Amino acid sequence: MAMKFRAHDTFFIRKGWLSKGMKYVQSKPDVFIAKDENPMDVLGIGANMVKALRYWLQAVGLTTEPNKGKRTQSFTLFGQSVYEHDRYIEEMGTLYLLHYKLASNKEEATAWYYFFNEFNMSEFTRDDFVSFLQQRIRMEEEASDVAIRSLNDDFTCIINTYLPRYKTSPNRVAPESNIDCPFGELGLIDILSREKKTYRKAIPSVNTRDPW
């Protein structure tokens, strides 16, 4: 099976991104490849963020695009359902489903798959996970040359996806900041020590476990 690392270009999912992406996939399926309009102007984000959003829509299972020909995006059945029933991703249950899609997507989000399905350390550092990931990669001949920088960036992106920045940098980011990823609401990762940069996998609160 193919493996993919650092396809996010270091950009984690920001609040509102997935909703914005779905809106334009619905109205303009070629939004990411159109030559008549600049995707940056249409989406209101920078070039690298456009690439990241294109990747994330597919990684969380909302959209798909062909490997050949005109690579326009279209909704998956799951994506169509989310767009019809919770396009602004306001329900906790929708977040859980998006997380499940991401964490089970070994081909498109390899580091996420290993982190949530096979990495069993409850308390860990970056080096712990990257070393574990390197061991798994060595078992896959086609992915044996993955750069350590890519693995480090994937770890950082995982942390930024699930851990709000007001916890990691409380003096620099306000709790209501919209730069955070909505997946942080799930409470799946917590920080043990900002100084030592140690983290732990967390058990979601009762409120988030009753999402509907």
Regions found by a protein language model. Name each.
Residues 1-212:
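Donor-sugar nucleotide-binding helix/loop cap in glycosyltransferases
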